[in-house]
């Protein structure tokens, strides 16, 4: 159940629990595809969408890249767990060229493997004192073996054309959690998404939403009230990693909401 990259909040550990609730479909739409931990591990055809265009362009580039190509870049820049200056040079070169292969190599060496892109399109993740490991090539090969079924797009979720027969899986940024990738998500975006899901339900289109109702003392009252119209499955989950190194194990009510 690997994704293409190590991605904060990925669903690879939860997918076996989610998949029995996925209906039959003509096309699987992964509306916020992130690290592809879902898209790569379901039956195709798949539309994998994410508004983060640099990440989508990276996936498109990887389709025609070999692992040797990745190793050549690492060797060219002399990258290792201790090569901070070399990492900064690679980061500078990516920000000049926007070469998606360089972005892929950067993420192996950045802090917590995060891909952080600012408003100017520049990669800003600091050096992470890390490099490739045995799982890096494993993820790459899993991507190569499963990417043929996927069409990639980088649209805002409201602009994705949903067809009759689609199943729409939705794993958006979470309104009440503090992860870096959630900071641009607002209550207005949340309302727009929930309205979209209501409209899909009205059209007879199946959807599934991953989210949290409660997290470390915070409650998503908007989502909790909305969810009463649909089926709610409460999940048990340990996060793959937490960049804030929180010691708190409990207090998160992660749910799967579906029609």
Swiss-Prot record:
InterPro entries: Ade_MeTrfase_dom_2, DNA_methylase_N6_adenine_CS, M_m6A_EcoRV, MeTrfase_D12, SAM-dependent_MTases_sf. Disulfide bonds: none annotated. One of its GO terms (biological process) is methylation. The keyword Membrane does not apply. GO terms for molecular function: S-adenosyl-L-methionine binding; sequence-specific DNA binding; site-specific DNA-methyltransferase (adenine-specific) activity. It holds the Pfam family MethyltransfD12. Belongs to the N(4)/N(6)-methyltransferase family. Monomer. PANTHER family: DNA ADENINE METHYLASE. May prevent degradation of viral DNA by the host restriction-modification antiviral defense system. NCBIfam families: dam. This is DNA adenine methylase.
